[in-house]
Amino acid sequence: MRPPQRHSSGRRTGFRRSGAALLGDPLCYVSPPPQALDGGAVRAVTPPPPAYRKRIKKPRAEADCEINWVVAMKIANAKTILLSMPFEAGGTPPWSFGGKPANSFDILLVRLETNDGLVGWGEAFSRGRDIALKQTMDTRLLPLILGRDATQISKIKHSLEFQLHNFGRISGVEYGIAAIDIALWDLLGKACGQPLYRLLGGAYADELEVYASLMRYGNVDDLVKATRRALDRGYRYIKLHEIGLDEIRAAVKACAGKAKVMIDVNCPWTVPEALAIAKELQDLDLYWFEEPAWPPENYLGLARVRQQGLHRIAAGKNAGSLHDFMSMISAGAIDIAQPDVAKTGGLTELLKIAALCEAHGVEFVPHCALFGPGQVATIHLSAAHRSTPIFERLFCDFEVELYGDATIPKNGKIKVPTGPGLGLEPVPEALEKFRLSV
């Protein structure tokens, strides 16, 4: 075997082989050839012989550690975990933000483990103790990825979508694929010893401005109290889920100019009704008007509301793919795009949507009614995208947060994690205490 070479700096390089570099294998030699550092083609390297094994640098927890060039990682184990976490939101329970009222928030996790023992976490969009979705993932999705190379993120995503597209392009199956995609990105970051935002191109900020996404209270008193609590906690952006005009006006008045207000009404009206209500609210200077018309895929109808010119229109949390956003933007339906990482194909799909939005001058503000890995992935993606001004956080309090204090906003802002991968691990207490035996 050819001995290690030295380049002009005198540093020893690893053994080389032809082919493109893959990120992820901690057994791969660290130091890339000098042309890789200067922007040239990066060559993958094979592990050195035993005599040189002591020179391998393994990933460290710090964000500034050296990148490890990855050869391959095999998915050895995969399982789902369903949690039901009680929460409080003020007022009279149960609470809603447009759907069925509830006292607890369900989180469907996927846990992937490689043959090297690395663990990656993902999250599927889930509501109402979704045992059916868990079983779908356990029986249809996870068996298809066992033994696959975890560094082949796009390839795995495409193969799953192609094999299972008859189940629908916006469905529980797609939510499960999104969860797997998030977990694969977590694995990649951990294998490289790098935070996810760095793999996405670097962060524009180390913390994000958060908007408090309030529950739908349905009465003025509870809503005004919740609005004031959000202001007291330092939030300067507040989203309402109310559909009553009296409630909306009362909350805007309670803000007294201290916070910008947007409303998310969850598609309750016909297009003519949405046009009329948009006109009723035109004096409130709303930050945006979200999903005013039914059905959510009626992009031409949504475009009519936008063409009225009274409010900026936001939508996208019910879209399933890049092509849905292409149709939305082509119809002139939105000012703000809101894909959900746990619904719309994971990080891989949202990266494409972000580029599409940037090319068309549409704001990219991901939807995030999530408290698991989907929430953390959205933090990283938002930090890495220049045109994302704010980050969504549902305004409620848990007995135990899945990530402890790390994802609780302070004075209306949230820190971007700096550890490898997602940078955070679920708190064992939460996994044990709130896990459903299904």
Where are the model-predicted features located?
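N-terminal basic, low-complexity leaders that serve as flexible interaction/assembly modules and, when applicable
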Residues: 72-143, 431-438
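Flexible C-terminal active-site loop/helix
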Residues: 74-90, 101-105, 353, 369-438
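Conserved, mostly hydrophobic/aromatic
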Residues: 75, 117, 141, 180, ...
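Metal- or metallocofactor-binding catalytic centers and their adjacent structured scaffolds
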Residues: 113-191
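N-terminal small/glycine-rich loop or linker at the start of catalytic domains
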Residues: 167, 192-216, 251, 256-258
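Active-site mouth loops of central-metabolism enzymes
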Residues: 208-221, 265-270, 314
